Amino acid sequence: MKPVIETHALCKSYHGRPVVDHLNLTVPEGCVYGFLGPNGAGKSTTMKMLLGLVHPTGGSVELLGHTLNEANRIALLRQTGSLIESPSGYLHLTARENLSIVADLKDVDRKDISRVLEIVHLTKDADRKVGQYSLGMKQRLGIAMALLGNPKLLILDEPTNGLDPAGIQEMRSLIASMPQTTGATVLISSHLLGEIE
C-alpha cells in the first residue's frame, strides 16, 4: 500500500527548544494508524504541521503523495478531514445547521450532511442544539464535520479525551470502522497505549 502521510526529518522548535525532533513517519493507506506519546510530546504540534497550520522548523510533509506547500495546501486539505484538540461548533445552532455551515465553507453539497450524520450515529439528534449535546456527541459531530466531502484522510487528535468509558468505547468502534465505512485512512493520536492498541 502506498503511504498517505510521510514525514522526512520533521522538526519544530519554539524559542530554541525542540518539540518535534527529526520525525520520520509513514502512514499506509487504508488503515487506522495510532500515534502514541505522553502529554507534551509534540503530537498535536505534529498534527498541526501535517495540516499546514504550523510551519515546521525543518523537514518536510507529504500528504496523499504530494509535498505539502503553500501552493497546494488548500487542495490537499480538501481531501483531508481533521479534528484537532476539541470539537468546535456553534452551541446555539443544531448539528444540522453546524454541518450546513461547514459544508458551505468546504464547498460540499449539503446532501452529504445526511451521510455523515448516519456514520456518526447522530441522525436522530441532528435537529437538537449542540449546546444540549454530551461531550461524546460533540466529538462525533466534530468527526462528522471532518467527514464532509468524503476525505481520503482523517487526522484525529485525541478524540476520546475527556469521554466517559461508554463514550470511549463508542468512539473507538466508530474510528475502527472508518476505513471500511468511509474509505478514509485515519491517523489518531493518544497518550494512552490501550487506546492505540
Regions found by a protein language model. Name each.
Residues 59-69, 75-76:
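Conserved ABC transporter NBD signature motif
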Residues 100, 104, 110-125:
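Conserved ABC ATPase "signature" region
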Residues 154-158:
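Catalytic Walker B motif of ABC-type/P-loop ATPase nucleotide-binding domains
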